[in-house]
Amino acid sequence: MWLRAFILATLSASAAWGHPSSPPVVDTVHGKVLGKFVSLEGFAQPVAIFLGIPFAKPPLGPLRFTPPQPAEPWSFVKNATSYPPMCTQDPKAGQLLSELFTNRKENIPLKLSEDCLYLNIYTPADLTKKNRLPVMVWIHGGGLMVGAASTYDGLALAAHENVVVVTIQYRLGIWGFFSTGDEHSRGNWGHLDQVAALRWVQDNIASFGGNPGSVTIFGESAGGESVSVLVLSPLAKNLFHRAISESGVALTSVLVKKGDVKPLAEQIAITAGCKTTTSAVMVHCLRQKTEEELLETTLKMKFLSLDLQGDPRESQPLLGTVIDGMLLLKTPEELQAERNFHTVPYMVGINKQEFGWLIPMQLMSYPLSEGQLDQKTAMSLLWKSYPLVCIAKELIPEATEKYLGGTDDTVKKKDLFLDLIADVMFGVPSVIVARNHRDAGAPTYMYEFQYRPSFSSDMKPKTVIGDHGDELFSVFGAPFLKEGASEEEIRLSKMVMKFWANFARNGNPNGEGLPHWPEYNQKEGYLQIGANTQAAQKLKDKEVAFWTNLFAKKAVEKPPQTEHIEL
């Protein structure tokens, strides 16, 4: 039983349902936009879709490595019915991620462009009336290096839950996060794009039937980390009212660059053929490079891959969020400790096997194809994983023993090794963020997603349940857009969409006919979401204690002025 989305031909629009017979046109602050109506089977009210609306001026030429500028107005009716290009990125990795994550029946091949600051809107509102529906703004994942708004079709979520869904793009990789650590290129350009998109939503969403006073930001992976950063950022004040981080928070250390960012900037400049005399020289030279030249530089840098040679402490798997004194005034750890953040209702969740298959096997090519691992190889591989987990060499034996020591089975050891990395990258940071948010007195909810979507790649082992990204199919209603979902999967997606939309409406996911989801308070109740959805307590409690303790040892051994890594 799959439900087909089909475009309502203007002429055959059924007057009985009051379907508009001409396509939707909406007036924005910058000019008029033309969209299209699409109906989802089973829903009388069509969804108006607007694709590729510019929310900022194209960040080209002298605007490269600068904060986004407001879009230029236009005087004609802008056609917003085709997908915008995705921000420039490694096309292979971008295409792969899109194919693995899309909830569409067919993945859309997207062009690349540095001119990419666009958003898509899905609104179920009757645009002839004054509606004020809750707004859900989606920030895609992809390690801040790849990804696109159009991978995610907001149609099913908008239709089922009567919410306005907005999917946004932001500069990625060198374009989005190049930082010299000083005023010449502060960095965080991609996050500033996210802020600009939220400003645009405040100014315009009412014309699309959305309520600017009820905006929920939600995102997965680097999108979840972005949401978490916006919760910590003074620049995002009053731009959103609730937040959801799926599988990624600002304490996910691989995405946040602490310490000196200059060496990475110099490495990029050298790879691009620029002199590194001063920051100003590097930035000036990189601004002269064509988009193609910077893409070539990106590919040469071999981001998003595990470097098995060389010193892992010097390996750079991605460019990330930096402490720029504007977006982030201090490190996420310091802001968390000071409780210096927006105390909006916050939902934070992880999947049961975050490092189960997609990240290690598809994105980073871990040498695990044999499907087993002995203790010695595990220790060496954990050291090579330093860029992801920041575990000091002297702590590796203890960490490996703790996770892998209980078994001699090398297949089990491999699974436990993947659990270890998942805990350090996602599980432990997510719980710490949720605890800090709760302790600041803000409503907090946690979940662990444990389900294997039928849409998973055939290459993924059947034993991997709750891999990174698996919840996306439920959140975006994939069973209503793709073929082949079971009744169980359809029910799960309906439930998840209802939880997410209730949270967007009320700051509380609970509602009639749904399993009870306890608030994350001192008892640390959370929801396990899957074939059997039920409340449980103390998610990753023991793991948080172990890692907090282990990282504290390292901090004590080394005086604070030397760089140490903390979760």
UniProtKB/Swiss-Prot annotation:
EC numbers on record: 3.1.1.1, 3.1.1.13, 3.1.1.56
Active site: 221 (acyl-ester intermediate), 354 (charge relay system), 468 (charge relay system)
Gene Ontology molecular function, alphabetical: carboxylesterase activity; carboxylic ester hydrolase activity; methylumbelliferyl-acetate deacetylase activity; sterol ester esterase activity
GO terms for cellular component: cytoplasm; cytosol; endoplasmic reticulum; endoplasmic reticulum lumen; lipid droplet
UniProt note on regulation of activity: Activated by CHAPS. Inhibited by chlorpyrifos oxon (IC(50)=0.21 nM), paraoxon (IC(50)=0.29 nM), or methyl paraoxon (IC(50)=49 nM).
InterPro entries: AB_hydrolase_fold, CarbesteraseB, Carboxylesterase_B_AS, Carboxylesterase_B_CS, Type-B_Carboxylest/Lipase
Subcellular location: Endoplasmic reticulum lumen; Cytoplasm; Lipid droplet
Signal peptide: 1-17
Domain of life: Eukaryota
Tissue expression per record: Expressed predominantly in liver with lower levels in heart and lung. Expressed in macrophages.
Subunit: Homotrimer and homohexamer. Binds to beta-glucuronidase.
Function: Involved in the detoxification of xenobiotics and in the activation of ester and amide prodrugs. Hydrolyzes aromatic and aliphatic esters, but has no catalytic activity toward amides or a fatty acyl-CoA ester. Hydrolyzes the methyl ester group of cocaine to form benzoylecgonine. Catalyzes the transesterification of cocaine to form cocaethylene. Displays fatty acid ethyl ester synthase activity, catalyzing the ethyl esterification of oleic acid to ethyloleate. Converts monoacylglycerides to free fatty acids and glycerol. Hydrolyzes of 2-arachidonoylglycerol and prostaglandins.
Family: Belongs to the type-B carboxylesterase/lipase family.
Name assigned to this protein: Liver carboxylesterase 1
This protein's encoding gene: CES1
